[in-house]
Amino acid sequence: HINSFYDLPDEIEMKRFGLKNVISREALKEIQNDKTGKDVSRFKNKEIDVLFSTKCTRGIDFPGEQCNSIVFTKYPNPDVKSPFWNILKKTNPNSYWDFYKDKARRELWQRIYRGLRFKEDHVYLLSPDTRVLDAFKRDIKNII
C-alpha cells in the first residue's frame, strides 16, 4: 500500500536510477483515476502479479492466494491537515495524541486485514519503515 504518490519515484528518477520493479507516481495517478477498478480486478484474477494502490485500504478484500504480501511505504499516520484533526487538537488537546496513535494503529491493521480473511490465511508484511514492523510485532504479541 502506498500512502502518498510522493513515496514513489517520478519517471525521471526511474530512468536515472534504472528502477524496474516499481511504478512511477505518474503511472499510479493514472491508475487511481480509473474508476472501473480494472487493475484491482486484474490483480484478483492473477492477470498481474503486483497491485500498486493508495486506495485499497477499505472495502476490497484479497483472501487466500489473491494476496500474500503487503508492502507499506511508510507507517499510515492520519492526515492531520483535515478539519477533524485541527478541531480535535484545539478542543481536546489532552486526548489528541492518544486518538492519533489509535487511528494510525487501526489503519495499519485495516490494511493488513485486506489480505487476511480467514484463520489459515497469511501475508508477508514488508516495509522500509521500521515503525510498521515494530508496531506489528508489538500488537501481535498482545493478540497471541
Where are the regions that the model predicts?
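Short, low-complexity, polybasic intrinsically disordered segments
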Residues: 133-144
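Conserved strand-helix element at the start of the C-terminal RecA-like helicase core
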Residues: 1-15
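Short, internal active-site loops enriched in acidic
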Residues: 5-7, 130-135
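Generic domain-boundary/flexible-linker signal
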Residues: 10-11, 81, 136
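Conserved RecA-like P-loop NTPase helicase motor core
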Residues: 29, 35-133
